[in-house]
């Protein structure tokens, strides 16, 4: 079985991004800038934000973090976003989720300039994705990362049956739309399964490419996968494991041990899809910089 190594690909991409940033610095005297806004204190979010800032620095991009109090009014957050929209040194704006209950997440998404929406969540970017204008939009980073893995590993997709488990706005919906686009990494017949789907296994067994993004540990078992399928595991779930120092370990939405015996190729957890998300965020930020500077 081929292991689709997202950690390795993300490291390769970091070197490519670093070279591009340095080249643009020598040409324009400027570098891409990413600003992350975090509201309140969430340990997982803080770790993720630190990782983003660290990776930005490693590739030569400017990175800043704006930390706001938990009780920040929505109006103030929107003012901060507006100032970033107008700042020519900022090419990517990301508001870390989750947000406190007094803030409307959709209002925040709408407030970000689509040209700086490097998370790919703005309705304008989603609409362009659905219409196939991929050169004029930003694609949500996790689906975009999966497409990058498919392309770099030369996985044949055209005309194949792709089954996506999950319909979230962050992964499931954009993933399904990406996989039906006329691209060399997609061009599939796509089925979407979700919590109301009856007999999910009857669909997953038909999948040439199976993408699991539901947030349920080891949900996909070997009997749900056909021999020779390509399996992409988006899930990150922490389960109890008394054999580890922490007493827990990370697993995906797929039972790796069982499914790996049948799959032709598969992403591990950790080290598969996860590392690609930040890499694609920086790639989107680079694209925003290129568009802003006519490069």
Curated annotation (Swiss-Prot):
SUPFAM superfamilies: Aminoacid dehydrogenase-like, N-terminal domain, NAD(P)-binding Rossmann-fold domains. It holds the Pfam family THF_DHG_CYH. Keywords: Amino-acid biosynthesis, Histidine biosynthesis, Hydrolase, Methionine biosynthesis, Multifunctional enzyme, NADP, One-carbon metabolism, Oxidoreductase, Purine biosynthesis. CDD domains: NAD_bind_m-THF_DH_Cyclohyd. Its EC number is 1.5.1.5, 3.5.4.9. GO terms for molecular function: methenyltetrahydrofolate cyclohydrolase activity; methylenetetrahydrofolate dehydrogenase (NADP+) activity. NCBIfam families: PRK14174.1, PRK14186.1. Catalyzes the oxidation of 5,10-methylenetetrahydrofolate to 5,10-methenyltetrahydrofolate and then the hydrolysis of 5,10-methenyltetrahydrofolate to 10-formyltetrahydrofolate. Homodimer. This is Bifunctional protein FolD. It comes from Chlorobium luteolum (strain DSM 273 / BCRC 81028 / 2530) (Pelodictyon luteolum). The lineage of its organism: Bacteria, Pseudomonadati, Chlorobiota, Chlorobiia, Chlorobiales.
């Amino acid at each position: 079985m081929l292991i689709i190594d997202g950690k390795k690909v993300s490291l390769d991409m970091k070197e490519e991004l670093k070279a591009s940033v340095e080249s643009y610095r020598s040409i324009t005297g400027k570098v891409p800038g990413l600003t992350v806004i975090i509201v309140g204190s969430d340990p997982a979010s803080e770790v993720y934000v630190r990782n983003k800032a660290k990776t930005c620095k490693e590739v030569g991009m400017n990175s800043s973090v704006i930390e706001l109090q938990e009780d920040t009014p929505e109006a103030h957050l929107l003012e901060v976003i507006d100032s970033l929209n107008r700042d020519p040194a900022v090419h990517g704006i990301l508001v870390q989720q989750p947000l406190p209950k007094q803030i409307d997440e959709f209002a925040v998404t709408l407030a970000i300039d689509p040209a700086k929406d490097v998370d790919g969540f703005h309705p304008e970017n989603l609409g362009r994705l659905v219409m196939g204008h991929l050169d004029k939009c930003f694609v949500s980073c996790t689906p975009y990362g999966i497409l990058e893995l498919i392309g770099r590993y030369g996985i044949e997709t055209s005309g194949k049956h792709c089954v996506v488990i999950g319909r979230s706005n962050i992964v499931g919906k954009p993933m399904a739309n990406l996989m039906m686009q006329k691209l060399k990494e997609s061009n599939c017949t796509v089925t979407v399964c979700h919590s109301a789907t009856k007999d999910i296994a009857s669909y997953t067994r038909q999948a040439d490419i199976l993408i699991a993004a539901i947030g349920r540990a080891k949900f996909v078992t070997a009997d749900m996968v056909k021999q020779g399928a390509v399996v992409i595991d988006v899930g990150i779930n922490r389960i109890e494991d008394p054999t580890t120092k922490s007493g827990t370990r990370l697993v995906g939405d797929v039972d790796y041990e069982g499914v790996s015996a049948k799959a032709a190729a598969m992403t591990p957890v950790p080290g598969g899809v996860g590392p690609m998300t930040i890499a694609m965020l920086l790639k989107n930020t680079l694209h925003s910089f290129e568009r802003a500077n006519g490069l």
